[in-house]
Swiss-Prot record:
Biological role stated in the UniProt entry: Found in functional membrane microdomains (FMM) that may be equivalent to eukaryotic membrane rafts. FMMs are highly dynamic and increase in number as cells age. Flotillins are thought to be important factors in membrane fluidity.
Similarity comment: family membership: Belongs to the flotillin-like FloA family.
Membrane spanning stretches: 6-26, 27-47
A GO term from the CC aspect: membrane raft
Key words of the record: Cell membrane, Membrane, Transmembrane, Transmembrane helix
Protein name: Flotillin-like protein FloA
Amino acid sequence: MFSLSFIVIAVIIVVALLILFSFVPIGLWISALAAGVHVGIGTLVGMRLRRVSPRKVIAPLIKAHKAGLALTTNQLESHYLAGGNVDRVVDANIAAQRADIDLPFERAAAIDLAGRDVLEAVQMSVNPKVIETPFIAGVAMNGIEVKAKARITVRANIARLVGGAGEETIIARVGEGIVSTIGSSKHHTEVLENPDNISKTVLSKGLDSGTAFEILSIDIADVDISKNIGADLQTEQALADKNIAQAKAEERRAMAVATEQEMKARVQEMHAKVVEAESEVPLAMAEALRSGNISVKDYYNLKNIEADTGMRNAINKRTDQSDDESPEH
């Protein structure tokens, strides 16, 4: 009986220990105690009940304590529950402390929740980043296209990381400044001879306003001559004028052809009327003879006149052809 009771008690103890170990990461608790971070077992159990991974909170807390940061479990757990990256925020705070940058935990957490890489921002504040633009084309006043590539050295502005514009805005603004500077040059050789004028002009415009960066310098890395845009435009305009002139000439030719066809149709119409009128002449002559308006003698005289006229016309026609065929002396 005694042995049975002992076995039951032992089983209960083992089950209790298993339940305890499933809720309380004893190894993590011991590590925290060894690091001088006092975390109660009840706190760890509460994290389990709130579906918070204790390791993702306690491990960064140990790291912060070793770095001398006064952070609490509640701060880290709140940031974890908000969907933030606790480990990265703590690393950013440690890096900021080492670089003597004022970065409270609340600001770092806000930057992280805003979707920014807060650790990279701190590192960029210490080691500025170089952004290289693609070739940006501008046209000088003499019509020559000039392409320039710039290297922009920027430093993260932690105070404007939340709500500030990103790298794309910096590149777009610098590109706009390069195009404006090239376009205001009277000759493309001015750009080639003094590329630093682009840097000075662009840098003086305060292009980092409203962005998450501070522009330290803008250096022109390369300048190339592309093509003569002015000449190309003039060529295209001349070609367009030529096409317009050809189209108008074709229109006039079509109108002339249409007019010619219309005149031919009218000639045929008039010829048909003449034939119709000639066909009525015999009827009119017969009616005149019948009514006595013309005598038979007059009729034959008219026929003789027509025959004489036809003969003269034939003779004249043959004479003209002979003159045309005779060789020149």
